[in-house]
């Protein structure tokens, strides 16, 4: 198992972690950054009208093959820890054929929050796979167990235990 932390080690927000093996690739969160380069507050409206290629060049999105719309999907699943935009805010750019593993409450809240955002900023999860507390599931080579806890919003997952079948490999805590 290999791990790439694309964003989230030196700042709060904008979390994006990639875990992969020879056969399986998963993404843990794909959040909107809270700060722009230079330290100013990130302005979501700065994304409007830009292509995926432009956003990769600006380091808002990451060059992850097979993750985005218009590409051949090469990612087996996306795990969303909770419904804060710094954990899910860039989902709208991702290929809609890739399953999104998320708690029921978080999925519903993201849908409801679209009422309060500009239409171009709406997040739609077309392939939601609802996860439940301590109900393990497999994505390719990985065995995953979500742990839901109280947070500042409903059905937050604070830990995903990700193991390579059959050996335990690591824990993700957003």
Where are these regions (language model features)?
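His/Asp/Glu-rich metal-coordinating catalytic cores
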Residues: 1-11, 15-77, 86-163, 174
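An N-terminally biased module of ancient metal coordination in phosphate/nucleic-acid-related enzymes
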Residues: 80
């Amino acid at each position: 198992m290999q791990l790439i932390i694309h964003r989230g080690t030196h700042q709060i927000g904008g979390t994006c972690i990639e875990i992969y093996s020879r056969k399986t690739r998963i993404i843990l969160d794909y959040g909107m950054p809270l700060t722009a380069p230079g330290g100013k507050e990130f302005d979501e409206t700065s994304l409007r009208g830009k292509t995926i290629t432009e956003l990769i060049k600006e380091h808002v999105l990451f060059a992850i093959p097979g993750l985005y719309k218009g590409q051949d999907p090469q990612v087996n699943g996306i795990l969303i820890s909770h419904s804060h935009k710094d954990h899910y805010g860039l989902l709208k750019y991702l290929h809609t054929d890739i399953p999104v593993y998320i708690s029921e409450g978080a999925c519903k809240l993201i849908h409801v929050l679209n009422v309060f955002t500009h239409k171009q900023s709406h997040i739609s999860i077309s392939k939601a796979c609802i996860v439940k507390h301590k109900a393990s599931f497999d994505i390719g080579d990985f065995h995953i167990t979500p742990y839901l806890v109280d947070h500042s919003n409903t059905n937050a997952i604070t830990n995903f235990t990700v193991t390579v079948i059959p050996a335990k490999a690591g824990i993700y805590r957003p």
